[in-house]
Amino acid sequence: MARTKKANDEVPTDSDSLKLKVAKQAAKLVKDEMVVGLGSGSTANLFIQELGKRIVEEELYIYGVPTSFDSRMVASTAGIPLISLDQCGEIDIAVDGADEVCKSTLSLIKGGGGCHTMEKIVDYHAKEFIVLADEGKLVDSLGDKTPVPLEVIPFAYSTILNKLLKMNTAPVIRTGSGKMGPVITDNGNMIIDVFISIDDAEETEIMLNNIPGVLENGVFSKCDKVLIGTSKKVEILKK
């Protein structure tokens, strides 16, 4: 008897298949006895699941460093042994997703899931930082379509909003679904989303972090390699 499709069943999209394609290829880059930074988000979760399969099938000794409560749960389910940042001397490779990738500079905007602070700590700490994305995430100019998230200390949110308004931006406090009020990060902070012109990713990253009360922002100026899923193949972009 054929299964009746329910209204809330998720139907795979072209984007989903491209994400899975890059996730599978990224999982092959991990070698035995590596410590791996585990990013957060839909593409990173696929990578975590594929890495878990390799660990089981090939009996690999690999440890993961999660960047969020969500990635911790996905990794635990996938059978990846986990350690904290202070337990590992170094991270061999970090694999993460992105909301936008600039074609020319490989700078990124991350943080759609509100995990960018922990992601940046782990990603920047790694010997090699690899980003996974489908071709729809590629842009010519960073920040034209996606706002930059700022994780802010609640005590300072109003002064940060005023500072951003004086910079001729339109900041918005991120609110969640399922509850009233602002989104609260794993670190207990709020998120302000702001559209801002980004001519130099590194300068913008530093400038936003210099605003008192901003813990971290979603501009990532450092990235070693990007795996882009296209309909024909996985393209590898390097700096």
UniProtKB/Swiss-Prot annotation:
Question: What's the catalysed reaction?
Answer: aldehydo-D-ribose 5-phosphate = D-ribulose 5-phosphate
Query: Per UniProt, which keywords does this protein have?
Result: Isomerase
InterPro entries reported for this sequence: NagB/RpiA_transferase-like (IPR037171), Ribose5P_isomerase_typA_subgr (IPR020672), Ribose5P_isomerase_type_A (IPR004788)
Name the residues that bind substrate.
Answer: 40-43, 96-99, 110-113, 137
Source species of the chain: Methanococcus maripaludis (strain C6 / ATCC BAA-1332)
One of the record's GO cellular component terms: cytosol
- Name by which UniProt lists this protein: Ribose-5-phosphate isomerase A
Q: Where are the transmembrane segments?
A: none
Pathway named in the protein's UniProt entry:
Carbohydrate degradation; pentose phosphate pathway; D-ribose 5-phosphate from D-ribulose 5-phosphate (non-oxidative stage): step 1/1
Biological function: Catalyzes the reversible conversion of ribose-5-phosphate to ribulose 5-phosphate.
Task: Identify the gene encoding this protein.
Answer: rpiA
UniProt similarity note: Belongs to the ribose 5-phosphate isomerase family.
PANTHER family under this entry? RIBOSE-5-PHOSPHATE ISOMERASE
- Which CDD domains does this entry report, sorted A to Z? RPI_A
